[in-house]
Amino acid sequence: MKTMNPYIRHLILLICCLGGMLAQPLSAAPQDPVEADRIVAVVGSDVITYFELRTRLTAALKQLQKQGTPLPPQDVLERQMLERLIMERAQLQYGRETGMKIDDTQLDLAIGRIAAGNKMTVPQFRAALEKDGVQYAQFREEIRNEMVTVRLREREVDSKLVISEGEIDNYLANQTATGSEEEYQLAHILLRAPESATPEQLQKLRQRGEQALKRARAGENFAQLTAAFSDAPDALQGGDLGWRPLARLPALYAEAGSRLQSGEVSDLLRSSAGFHIVKLVSKRGGSAPASVQQTHARHILIRSSEVLSEAEATRKLEAVRERIANGVDFAEQARLYSQDGSAAKGGELGWLNPGDTVPEFERAMDALKINEVSQVVQSPFGMHLIQVLERRERDVSAERQRAVARQALRERKLDEAYQDWLRQLRDRTYVENRLDEQ
C-alpha cells in the first residue's frame, strides 16, 4: 500500500484533531464517563464537551512536539484550545443559520482532490487514514466543516473587500520610489478584544500583552508564547505569516516590520481587533516583478438555481468531464452546456493575468497542468470545469501593474477584515464558558 505523505498526514491530524497518546502526563480523553461528558462551553445552541476539548488538545500537543516547540503550561493550552473550539462552533452555527450547506457530492469531490494530491485513490487514502487511527466518518465531517468555514470567509469577507483607485495609485508610487520589494518573514501574536470591550477588559488584555512582550524580549521561544497567548488561527503554527513583501502584509504589521531587525520584536500594537506583537524572523531582498505569468484557459459554467441544485449542477459537469476524458472535444461541450458568455467561443477565456478571475477560480486554475481539466470548481458564479491550454511570461504593462497592485492590496486587507469579522461574530454569539466549573 502507498504511504501517506508526512505533510498531508500532519495536516489531517491538525484538521481532524485526532492522534495517539503522548509521552506527556496527559490522557487523550478522560477515563471517567461523567467527566468526559461534562460540558465545558455552551455556544449558541451547541455544546462543547470535555472529551472534545481533550481530544483536540491531544492532537495539538502532538503537533507542537513534532515541531520541537517547548510546551506551554497545560492549563494555558487548554484555555486557548477551548477558545478556538468556540470560534469554530460559532462559525459553523452561523453557516447553518444562513443556509450554508456542503452536500455529499461536493464533499466527495473535495476528498477526491485531497487523495489525488497525495497520489492515492480515495480507497487507498481511506485505508491510510484508518492506519493512522483516523476514523473516516469523522474525517469527512471535519472536512465538511472546514469547507463551510472557507465558504463563509469567501462570502462574508472576501467578496466585500473594496480596493479604491487611490489606494492603487499610492501602492504603485511607493513601488516606484523604493525600486525593490524586500520580503519579510513575520510571526505574530494576536490578543483579540471584544467589539464592545470595557476599559477594564482592555486594560486586562493590555497587561496580558505586556506580559507576553516582556517574555518575548527576554528571549523566550516565540512559538511557545504564540501557542500560549495568541487568539489567531495560526497560533499552533508559531504565528508564522510566511514570506511576504510589505505590500501584502496588514498595514499595522508592515509598518512595524519595516522598522525591525531580524530577531527583534515590536512594541505592543493596538488595532480594532485587539493587541498585537510582531517578530521579524528574517528578511530577504527582491525586486519588483517585471513580468507576470499569464494563463490561457477555457471553462464550462453551469449555474445553480431554484430548479437546478448545486449537487445537480455538479453531477451534470462530472458527466461532461467524463466525456471529455473519453475524447470528446472540450470546446464542443462548452458550446452545448456552458451558461457563460464564452460558450459560443468554446469556453475560451483568452490570456488571463493574476487577479483577472475570482480567487476560487484562480486557485483551481493555477493548480492545473497544461491541458489538464479540473474537477468541478465552485465560485460565486456557479460550478466550473477549467482547462489550462498554455502559460507564458509577459512584461507587466501599466494596466497589468494596477491589477497586480489590486491583488496585493486585497491580500493585505483580507487578514484584517477576517479578524474583524471573527471578532464581531464572537461578540454576537451567546457563549458560556464552564471550563472552571467542577
Swiss-Prot record:
Q: What organism does the record attribute this protein to?
A: Dechloromonas aromatica (strain RCB)
| Function, as annotated | Chaperone involved in the correct folding and assembly of outer membrane proteins. Recognizes specific patterns of aromatic residues and the orientation of their side chains, which are found more frequently in integral outer membrane proteins. May act in both early periplasmic and late outer membrane-associated steps of protein maturation.
GO cellular component terms attached to this protein's record: outer membrane-bounded periplasmic space
User: What name goes with this protein?
Assistant: Chaperone SurA
Q: What Gene Ontology terms describe what this protein does at the molecular function level?
A: peptide binding; peptidyl-prolyl cis-trans isomerase activity; unfolded protein binding
Output the GO biological process annotations, alphabetical, semicolon-separated: Gram-negative-bacterium-type cell outer membrane assembly; protein folding; protein stabilization
Where does the protein end up?
A: Periplasm
Catalytic activity, reaction form: [protein]-peptidylproline (omega=180) = [protein]-peptidylproline (omega=0)
Instruction: List the EC numbers from the record.
Output: 5.2.1.8
Q: Give the top-rank taxon of the lineage listed in the UniProt record for this protein.
A: Bacteria
Q: Where is the signal peptide?
A: 1-28
Residues in domain PpiC? 181-282, 292-390
